[in-house]
From Swiss-Prot:
Described purpose of this protein according to its UniProt entry: Structural component of the T=16 icosahedral capsid. The capsid is composed of pentamers and hexamers of VP5, which are linked together by heterotrimers called triplex. These triplex are formed by a single molecule of VP19C and two copies of VP23 which bridge major capsid protein VP5 multimers together. Triplexes occupy the local threeflod positions between capsid hexamers and pentamers.
Protein name according to UniProt: Triplex capsid protein VP19C
Keyword field contains Thylakoid: no
Quaternary data: Interacts with VP23, VP5 and UL25.
Encoding gene per record: UL38
UniProt keywords, alphabetically: Capsid protein, Host nucleus, Virion
UniProt keyword Magnesium present: no
Organism, as annotated: Human herpesvirus 1 (strain KOS) (HHV-1)
Similarity annotation: Belongs to the herpesviridae VP19C family.
Compartments where located: Virion; Host nucleus
Ranges annotated as spanning the membrane: none
């Protein structure tokens, strides 16, 4: 699962 760097 990838985390969104927002």
């Amino acid at each position: 699962m990838k985390t969104n760097p927002l």
